[in-house]
Amino acid sequence: MSKHGVLDQLAKLGFSSESLKQSVTRKLVWSRDASHFQIEPATTLRASNIQEVSRILEAASGTHTPVTFRSGGSSLSGQTLGRGLVVDTRSGFQAVVKIESTQVTAEPGVTLSRLNGHLLGAAKKVGPDPASLVASTLGGAVGNNSSGMTCGTKFNSYATIIGAKIVFADGQILDTLLPDAEKHFRTLKPKLVKELETIRDQIRADGALSSEVTRLFTLKNTMGYSLNSFLDFENPLDILTHLMVGSEGTLGFLGEITMGLLPVKKVKATNLLIFESLEVANDSLMEIISQDPAAIELMDRTSLSALDSQELLPAEVIAVLGKNSTAVIVEFEADAQEELAQAQRRFEKKFVKNLVFAGVTENSLRNRLWAMRKNLYAIVAKARPEGTTALLEDVAVPPEKLTIACKKLSELCEKHGYGTPVIFGHVRDGNIHFMISDDFATKERVKAFENFTADMVELILSLGGNLKAEHGTGRAMAPFVEAQFGKELFEIIKRVKKAFDPLGILNPGVIIAASDTEYLENLKITQQVDAIVDSCVECGYCESSCPSAGLTLTPRERIVAFRELSRQPASVRKTLTKELHYQADQTCATDGMCQVNCPVNINTGTFVKEIRAKNQTGLTQGLGKVAQKNWGTIASLAGRALRVAGLVPTLAATGSKLLAAITPKGLTPIWSKSIRAEGFSRSKLPSGQSKEFAYLPSCMNEVFGDSSIARVLEIANQSGEPVFIPENLKGFCCGTPFSSKGLTKAYQRQQSKNKDLLTSLSQKTLIIDGSSCHQTLSGQSDIRTIELSEFVAENLLDIPVKTRVGTIVLHPTCSGEATGANSAMVAIANRIAYTVITPANWRCCGFAGDRGLLIPELTVNATSLEAEELVSVDALRVSNNQPCQIGMSGGTGKAYISILEAWVRSVS
């Protein structure tokens, strides 16, 4: 392998020098995924389309360079890690290509959550439904043959794939859905076709082999390759397509995937049962299965304790918990209410004594119950001892053997020093997960893990089970594929690999082990960095909502980078520190959206703010204090400067770009025509006499301005809902401009100043405009604080609408998501428009107050998918934060206004 050889070859094939530039940061953050392994790649690359992947594999074949494809990085068995060339196939593969009535075609980087969001309007969904929907990509789900909570083996990736565009190891491309695809396949890969037909005939002719394959795949099974395809399909093209499912990047690359769709059932009822012990719960399993529910999820007592530590257990559950209690979630779904009611009645009759929540249909409570299970892995992993790495095992046994399996697994964990394990899983399918943790700091601990694994393998196989049900073989179970399949079928697995990948360059070491001890090598050591992020298990749930994903780093990658910074030698630390200034700091919007999806409630933005504060000097902290003291004047002058710039837009744009070119990156704001320059003095806003409401206009009004605010206040006064505005607010600011930049002393002074003001208004409900200002101010006191759009939604929504809007497109804000204020924007939009659209691709715009002016590529990156989704939509576009409106206007090229302005237009 020659890393320079493959880069030189890629340059000859048309890759730019910029795209081939290597980064120490990227190598280190891509050396880890959600698994317990760590392998640093020699080379990294981002692919933008299937043609680039074709050229990458052509170059890799010519230079014998190992290639590993990395998408969501949420896999738990080490299959997205490699020593050769690691290729990101998420950032550039985000298109939902075509939605039809029975199928959807999408690129592999689209998360399952976002894909289902696009299908929601048609009441359809894809089959695989892993707990990691927000992180798991379509390519990863198919590559691992993901299943999940409800799909079982009936609707998993294998069962629902229709076709794909496949890139073979030598770079050749085959579209399996073209009319002449089989003919083309035979011409393109005659040796592969012949070998597939030979293996098919061999398995079918041998009754014992056929029976064993059937047995192995009756349960969930992600060990080895999908050998059941040789029994399920005659046509080599169909065998090819289904062998790719679960192949974990070892047979080729899926550049575009077509999946069959399932209907979303119209009504659902969720039940939560508590049994006195794990054994009693498992003994009840066959009776529960006989009721034919859509899902059965088990959580043992240790799981419940971990959930309780995060305050995620409802009081009703806590009240009935005993020492060994085990919870089971059972869900029924149907297309008709009566059908659902009948199923629920039958179930309640059998299990009335165990039901804590019965037949829950209200979405908020249903979601709360399911959040317990979906976030469980990361929450349990958070509770691990400091400095240890979490290992989530994943096995399947016949459901009737679950009781003995759980009992024996618990005994094994105790025997090998892991204590009482955490056990949970999809028990309808006999699929259980159990978590252990270890620091692997000594040879003795590694030996303990080796002995534990050997005993676990023996136990599961003795029960007729499978060693990996959902998480893929990866490196974790590759040495045990022969034990799972037997010698004869293992030889067939090796023949499949050889036929697809004769040079062995595709993800070597995955599925077919590089050594018998591969599962004991390259084990991840977790470094302690900061209390804010130390509980991170690197699951990747945070990544899909991050505005810098695909541009620089994601929240998980920022955390990993700083973990690596703490352990690397001085020479690497120097380079890493330099790269992280832009990749980790300057391109972090600190919006906190990562916390929304994080199961353990980590706000990486807070961590980055802390880093910024540490990097501030005495001089910059002092200048921050001066700015805070004179903030009213600064905001007013900034507004005037923007108005002047608006009069000479070309000069302003050119001048700011020239200045930015000669100053350090991120120091000079770049003027844009999307900037609204209507700043006004807050003292001119109309104040009413009110004992109930006090309005604190944000300083953004001085800078950018929203003239509709004055009209909102006038309408409120006229409608008998007057709003009082305190005097002397010239210097008022929530403090976000200081906290976001790490100017802690200035922020503390502003917070102290605000405290006196808020105390004087403690008898009133506080109102502030702008969702980001609302979020910050809400955290500074216990006084009820609402965003101005919430005031309108709660008090003025009955005012008659005179002009209804045809279609409104909403851009929810990250801060509005955190506080719940986005719901007010939705309510107002539904009141004034016939049609309201929330884009499936919305995420934080990355403007972050002024970050979009300082690092404009951040906003362009963050808004690109949302802009593309809406390119042909004729609508009024609104949001509820002035900086976000500027960011969205600039990023999409379409003007965004405030929801308040839209409402004022409609009622005036």
What are these regions (language model features)?
Residues 501, 604-908:
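Iron-sulfur cluster-binding electron-transfer modules in prokaryotic oxidoreductases
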Residues 36, 76, 119-163, 168, ...:
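A gly/ser-rich beta-alpha-beta helix-loop segment of oxidoreductase catalytic cores
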Residues 293-386, 421, 425, 555-563, ...:
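Terminal amphipathic helices with adjacent charged low-complexity linkers/tails
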Residues 512, 518, 549-583, 601-627, ...:
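Non-heme iron-sulfur electron-transfer modules
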Residues 35-67, 89-130, 146-198, 263-276, ...:
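N-terminal glycine-rich flavin-associated loop
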Residues 518-538, 568-590:
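Ferredoxin-like iron-sulfur electron-transfer modules
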Residues 1-58, 62, 72-102, 131, ...:
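N-terminal flexible segment immediately upstream of the FAD-binding catalytic core
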Residues 504-510, 541-565, 587-614, 776-778, ...:
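Iron-sulfur cluster-binding cysteine motifs and their immediate structural context
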